[in-house]
């Protein structure tokens, strides 16, 4: 997408967002960014270290794409606990149809192995209904996730954006997404599995349906409100303008309506079990 306005948050802005989240009771923070030269490793190390120093009782999750092993090690030593890197597809041919020629499935899987070896709680996952995806591809993904045994599984429906090469492809199917979510929950009872914003974008009750299908994580947006609209991954993205506090109140009401309560604890995955303090 060459028409989107890209942005980078300064360390002071990120820390301010974390302070607001901490005030609201959040004890885990997710820092997500594109695979771009603007996201310098040294600056990220400093930011992670600053968050760790300010919030020693919080979990720090990074989602910054493919990096060198050295970079992953430096982030970990600075204080990061978790890293989310969706493998997206385990089929080599399908992977090449989704990515630029300079990217490879083998390197992405190598990154996942590095992350696990370093000691991160590692997340991987898929996009359901991505262009050219088949049922056989999904079976390969299920088998890979069973072998890899991630602590986190990120998955949601594909949603097109009008300024991308895949703009003409239909969105992923809600029911198939929910079925796969349930399969992963049965396979991995303690895994952290988010009910993604993409679900809420595909259907008004998508987030609640995701929770009922087996998701156990939701991620309110703490980014500065003036930047959120620029984070345009797909068309009609849900909640681009809601403030964090307003979003939390709405979220608590939504979950209460289906019989759930919000826990703001770290939710660490230890020895195959999810630990949450009540």
Question: What residue spans do the PLM features occupy?
Answer:
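Auxiliary Fe-S-binding modules of radical SAM enzymes
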Residues: 146-278
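Aromatic-anchored, glycine/proline-accented short structural segments
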Residues: 111-160
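Catalytic cores of alpha/beta
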Residues: 68-77, 130-145, 200-213
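Conserved, mostly hydrophobic/aromatic
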Residues: 31, 85, 115, 145, ...
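Generic structural signal for helix capping and beta-alpha/helix-loop junctions
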Residues: 38, 70, 92, 132, ...
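Alpha-helix-loop-beta-strand connector modules within alpha/beta enzyme cores
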Residues: 39-64, 102-123, 148, 168-191, ...
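Short, small-residue-enriched loops and turns at beta-alpha junctions
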Residues: 35-40, 101, 129-134, 166, ...
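Core AdoMet radical
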Residues: 1-15, 21-42, 47-48, 52-112, ...
């Amino acid at each position: 997408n060459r028409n989107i306005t890209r942005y980078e948050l300064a360390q002071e802005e990120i820390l301010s967002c974390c302070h607001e989240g901490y005030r609201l009771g959040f004890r885990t923070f997710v820092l997500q960014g594109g695979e771009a030269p603007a996201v310098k490793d040294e600056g990220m190390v400093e930011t992670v270290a600053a968050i760790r120093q300010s919030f020693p009782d919080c979990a720090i999750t990074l989602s910054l794409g493919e990096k060198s092993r050295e970079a992953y090690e430096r982030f970990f030593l600075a204080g990061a606990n978790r890293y989310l890197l969706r493998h997206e597809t385990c089929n080599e041919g399908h992977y090449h149809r989704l990515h630029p020629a300079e990217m490879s499935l083998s390197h992405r899987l190598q990154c996942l192995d590095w992350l696990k070896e370093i000691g991160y709680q590692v997340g991987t996952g898929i996009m359901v209904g991505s262009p050219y995806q088949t049922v056989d591809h999904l079976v390969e993904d299920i088998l890979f996730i069973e072998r890899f045994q991630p602590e986190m599984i990120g998955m949601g429906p594909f949603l097109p954006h009008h300024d991308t090469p895949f703009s003409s492809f239909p969105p992923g199917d809600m029911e198939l997404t929910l079925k796969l979510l349930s399969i992963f929950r049965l396979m991995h009872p303690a895994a952290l599995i988010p009910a993604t914003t993409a679900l809420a974008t595909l259907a008004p009750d998508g987030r609640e349906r995701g929770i009922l299908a087996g998701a156990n994580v939701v991620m309110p947006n703490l980014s500065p409100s003036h930047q959120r609209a620029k984070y345009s991954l797909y068309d009609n993205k849900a909640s681009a303008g809601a403030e964090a506090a307003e979003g939390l109140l709405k979220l608590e009401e939504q979950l209460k309506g289906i019989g759930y309560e919000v826990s703001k604890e770290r939710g660490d995955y230890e020895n195959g079990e999810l630990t949450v303090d009540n």
